[in-house]
Amino acid sequence: MAIDFSQYQTPGVYTEAVGAPQLGIRSSVPTAVAIFGTAVGYQTYRESIRINPDTGETITTQILALVGEPTGGSFKLSLAGEPTGNIPFNATQGQVQSALRALPNVEDDEVTVLGDPGGPWTVTFTKAVAALTKDVTGLTGGDNPDLNIASEQTGVPAMNRALAKKGIKTDTIRVVNPNSGQVYVLGTDYVVTRVNAGEDGEANTRDDLYTIQRVVDGGHIDPGDIVQLSYRYTDPNYHEVIRFTDPDDIQDFYGPAFDEAGNVQSEITLCAQLAITNGASTILACAVDPEGDTVTMGDYQNALNKFRDEDEIAIIVAGTGAQPIQALVQQHVSAQSNNKYERRAILGMDGSVTPVPSATRIANAQSIKDQRVALISPSSFVYYAPELNREVVLGGQFMAAAVAGKSVSAIAAMPLTRKVIRGFSGPAEVQRDGEKSRESSEGLMVIEKTPRNLVHVRHGVTTDPTSLHTREWNIIGQQDVMVYRIRDYLDADGLIGMPIYDTTIVQVKASAEAALVWLVDNNIIRGYRNLKARQIERQPDVIEVRYEWRPAYPLNYIVVRYSIAPETGDITSTIEGTTSF
């Protein structure tokens, strides 16, 4: 698609491969592997909070009732270790009240008593106090006389500080006493309260903030106590594009790759681990965000769309091996590459349960037929999972992640052919040599196990085997690096926005040549020729740079030709057991 400068274009440096899409300036060469797929969906967090003093007036009510029908004597009450004097078994409410008000830890206006002589007595404290204790050794008569005490508190518990994380799954909150290990009970000891609805003002979304409040009546958490909480939460940015350089950070964020049964629960974690194992230094990840329990292709597409205009991406990898994702990724790669964000994709088919037949794999490659997209074959591979301490069968999408890591770890001119892929024991499907050759010729990047037990790429091809230039993975890679570098050089020289003088064309040509020389010196391309720069007469604000470039072609074949030399002279023996002629 030719650049149409008769239509308005944003001022900048534009590049155009003859017969290919228009490409615009962005930034330096991208090297990140972008992965989208499923994740655990939450993170786990632990924190401690101190329970604030209750707010408002707290009322403590205690009911005292004599049992066993005592006929004489007295009893004592104690509050926080401070005992009263003797209280007659048939005391009036005034006698009980006077005894309690005489305690050093109670003010006169903090306690009142109601009841008949001999009880029961209702004791009301206007503050939070512990239950009264008793001494009934002074009671006489009756049948084992005793004093029953029932206590309850009513009041308003304070609002504690908000918990540290947003998007808490409230049903996963666990509250314990850090000293005794006692697990507090929801509803009995505490309640969960929403502090606010977050920036969106909508309740029950991922930016909500929560806290806990103690239950005053009957609960086991007191003001001033320090309690420890653990919970699961989904950060509001959990399903956005996030940059990683450390595999441990990826696992901490998206969860372990496998569940206890050995099923893949975090496609992102496993893909990222394999990409980094094979040389990737930067991962851009985006977790799918399903609305229900089942992940749909629309969920994958939503995650893929979030990679738009991300300038670090070199290769896209899908965490799913479902066939419908292939067309979605191809459309994404094509649209972004036509809009100054050049990128490629390596995909795989999921044959972990039922292998995808070779004919189907070939048909999938033919339906894609894009020099920017590679499709891995076969569809299943054996992988040793150290966390499970056993081998599992994975789909081809995980091999695609490993190959993507290998690709970005080398210079653009380096072919993928015969490159060793680490992390796998080998294909889980048996293929004959003829079948593998046919697949390679039809646009499948075949992974095989060599007689030396190495797992490598048989031939680094794209899904477009039309010609050498569209077939070889490293040629389109060289082109991407080349246009990025030329745009960088031209833009860095500050030419855009300057007036065009007689020397401007020379400056533009010199800047482009400096970029091309750098590419040659760094073994990105082999060479270039016929570099020209001209001002277009019909569009005088456009300077066009043209040249031809030569890629570093992959060495795919070595031909050794030989023939039998006829005997032309006498045969003589030179060393015992050998002859010469």
Swiss-Prot record:
Subcellular location(s) of the protein? Virion; Host cytoplasm
User: Key word Isomerase present in the record?
Assistant: no
Specify where it is mainly localized. Answer: virion
Any one GO CC term of the record: virus tail, sheath
Q: Which domain of life is it from?
A: Viruses
Please give the positions of the paired cysteines in each disulfide bond: none
Does the record's keyword annotation contain Iron?
Answer: no
Write the record's keywords in alphabetical order, separated by commas: Host cytoplasm, Viral contractile tail ejection system, Viral genome ejection through host cell envelope, Viral penetration into host cytoplasm, Viral tail protein, Viral tail sheath protein, Virion, Virus entry into host cell
Q: Which GO terms describe its biological process?
A: symbiont genome ejection through host cell envelope, contractile tail mechanism
State what this protein does.
Answer: Polymerizes as an extended structure around the baseplate-tail tube complex. During ejection, the sheath shifts to a contracted form, thereby making the inner tail tube protrude through the host cell envelope.
Please state which protein family the record places this protein in.
Belongs to the myoviridae tail sheath protein family.
Q: Subunit details for this protein?
A: Homomultimer.
Can you name this protein?
Tail sheath protein
